[in-house]
Each structure stands twice: as C-alpha cells, then as structure tokens.
Swiss-Prot record:
Active site: D12, D136
InterPro entries: Aldolase_TIM, His_biosynth, HisF, IGPS_HisA/HisF, RibuloseP-bd_barrel
Provenance organism: Haloarcula marismortui (strain ATCC 43049 / DSM 3752 / JCM 8966 / VKM B-1809)
Principal location: cytoplasm
Keyword Amino-acid biosynthesis (UniProt): yes
UniProt pathway: Amino-acid biosynthesis; L-histidine biosynthesis; L-histidine from 5-phospho-alpha-D-ribose 1-diphosphate: step 5/9
Higher taxonomy: Archaea, Methanobacteriati, Methanobacteriota, Stenosarchaea group, Halobacteria
SUPFAM superfamilies: Ribulose-phoshate binding barrel
Gene name as annotated: hisF
Subunit structure: Heterodimer of HisH and HisF.
Protein name: Imidazole glycerol phosphate synthase subunit HisF
Reactions catalysed, as given in the entry: 5-[(5-phospho-1-deoxy-D-ribulos-1-ylimino)methylamino]-1-(5-phospho-beta-D-ribosyl)imidazole-4-carboxamide + L-glutamine = D-erythro-1-(imidazol-4-yl)glycerol 3-phosphate + 5-amino-1-(5-phospho-beta-D-ribosyl)imidazole-4-carboxamide + L-glutamate + H(+)
Length: 271
C-alpha cells in the first residue's frame, strides 16, 4: 500500500514587544516579520484540510526559556489534527508537559544534540511516534564533514546547527540522522537554513541525502514556494511530508489547491 504524502503548515512563534505570543515569518532564520495570531491561524489551518500542524517556539532554545505552554494549550483546543510542538524541549519532563498541554508529538533539536539519550528516554516513555527530531541544516563547503553531496558543481556537507540556527555544532547531518533513528526517533523534521523563506524550492540535495540514509519518515521543510516544489521534494528526494509556512500564511496557495495539484500528478494525498 502506498502511503499518502502529508501536507503540513507550520507557524513560527515568538514573543512580541507586549510579551504576547505571535507568529513571525523570515528568511534564512532572520529578518522576522509579524504574521498573525497563533491561535487564530491554528484554527484556520485546522479547517483547511491540512494533514498535521506544527507549532515552533523559535527562540525558546536560544533564550534558554521554557516553551509557551499556555499558547500551546490554546492552539491545541482549536486543532483536531496531529499537533507537533517544538522549541525549548530539553528534558523528559519538558516532553511530558508539552504532551500534557495538548501536543501529539514533540520536536526536539538543540536538546537532543546536547543530550542524545533524551531520544531514547522519550521514545521509551512516550513512544517513538511522539518523538520528532528536528535538524536545522546548513551547507558547508570545506573538508570538515563526513558525508559529501554535489551541489551546483561543488562538494558540500550539511552541518547541524542549534539555538535556531545561531550556532554550528560541527556535527554532520547524515551522521546525526542515522544516530537519531537508531535511538528511537519516530520522524525526522529537516530544515534548511540556506533555503528558509526563499520560496526557491526545498534543498533537494539535503532532503535526498537524508531520505536515502534513513527509513524513518522525513518531513521536508524550508524553501517551498509552490505546489511544484512539493512535487519535487516528494518525487526527487523521497520525502514523506512537505511542510510550508509563508505560501499558506499569505494565501499564495491554499492547502486544497496544493493537494489537487499533487493529486493531478499522481502523488497520493488525502483529499
């Protein structure tokens, strides 16, 4: 049986100047602009035909604070499709509290790189299906990597970054994806700093490299500018889900239009 490809909208949430949760959109993890209210946007996406929904607290890890659980709870009250929440999750207790607030899955990046055993502990306590390992990847054109890919005629490797892309780790994405899968991650959520917000398409070399390495489902993120970009990441890279933000936030394409296009190309989606 062919599994359907999932279409997933995502909101990047930060604290605004009044201390309230707000959705922001940026480019290359920078130049953030106010986009809307997280609860209202969640409600709209719940009714849009989305397969899942992702809520990312984009500064919790960098600022060393806890995830906005009150906002997560308010969003969960409006969302009746699987909800993944990420940002600031560092401990088993954080996982438990985030799930208790209404998340179906947690997305962990910096916390898992700092304490890889958190993946094992989370999978054992809550089930692998709850543990999504997020990777913020950045291209590097030097000799310090483990696994190299041809990109625009040059050889590059992909580095894991942490704290919202602010810090490099020296850790090769392919090595980390393999380890995360072995430790019990139920999904991999792969972001590209180079493609983020550009609407020029997903980072296909990155996504293909990860998809070719692991059997765990891969959510492709960053760079989607059209339904054609989703077709490309499904067909050419082998991703299991396509995540997008700005093209949906600003009404450039609807989720229904995206699914209809993919269906017309023979890509299995839930209509």
């Amino acid at each position: 049986m062919t599994l359907t490809k999932r279409i997933i909208p995502c909101i990047d949430v930060d604290v605004d100047e009044n201390g309230d949760a707000a959705v922001y959109t940026g480019v290359n993890f920078e130049d953030l602009e106010y986009t809307g209210d997280p609860v209202e946007m969640a409600k709209a996406y719940n009714e849009s035909g989305a397969d899942e929904f992702v809520f990312l607290d984009i500064t919790a890890s960098a600022e060393g604070r806890e995830t906005m659980l009150d906002t997560v709870s308010a969003v969960a009250d409006e969302v009746f499709i699987p909800l993944t929440v990420g940002g600031g999750i560092r401990t088993r207790a954080d996982i438990k509290e985030t799930l208790r607030a209404g998340a179906d899955k947690v997305s962990i990046n910096s916390g898992a790189i700092a304490e890889p055993d958190l993946i094992n502990e989370g999978a054992a306590a809550f089930g692998s299906q709850c543990i999504v390992i997020s990777v913020d990847a950045r291209r590097r054109f030097d000799s310090e990597g483990e696994h190299y890919t041809e990109v625009d005629g040059e050889s590059c490797w992909f580095e894991c970054t942490v704290k919202g892309g602010r810090e490099g780790t020296g850790l090769d994405v392919i090595e980390w994806a393999t380890e995360a899968e072995e430790r019990g991650a139920g999904e991999l959520f792969v972001n590209s700093i180079d493609a983020d917000g550009t609407k020029d398409g997903y980072d296909i070399p990155l996504m293909k490299a990860v998809c070719d390495t692991v059997s765990t489902p891969v959510i492709a993120s960053s760079g989607c500018g059209s339904p054609e970009d989703m077709e490309e990441v499904f067909v050419d890279a082998g991703a299991d889900a396509g995540l997008a933000a700005s093209i949906f936030h600003f009404g450039e394409y609807s989720i229904a239009e995206t699914k209809e296009y993919l269906d017309s190309k023979g890509i299995p989606v839930r209509l």
